[in-house]
């Protein structure tokens, strides 16, 4: 059965300008999509509803403790993006990466990988160039990262955006993943 619905602007998330694949600037307006009977037809509506439900229930507890001035509880999230940077030549030899974007097979971790030599090591010049370009692209969208560093495994790195309201952080996380792939695949 097909659901009919309507699209509404999610004014809790900021609109932004993002380049289309052909470099045309496009205004993106965050939206929600619901059926005429109220069912969520997207993934954002349940998030917004759960944020509101959490606020309502938390306010009950806050009032039990005697606080009569609070009006709302706002949740925040600061998701980390851990990622691997793989050279194009290596990528082209790995069908699992090509078809799924993930490692489906491989070898056990080399002995000694649990040591901190990569984690505390300096960031390689090519990786730092990637991180710099990534930050510049994210800043254009109003997304700021708090930290970026090597992770434990070889070629593994991390980007940690600044905490934000849950729905905005979720929107930013989707954009971060998109921009990471775009920057990594650019020549």
Segment roles from a protein language model:
Residues 1-187:
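Glycine-rich, acidic/polar active-site loops that bind/position phosphate-bearing ligands
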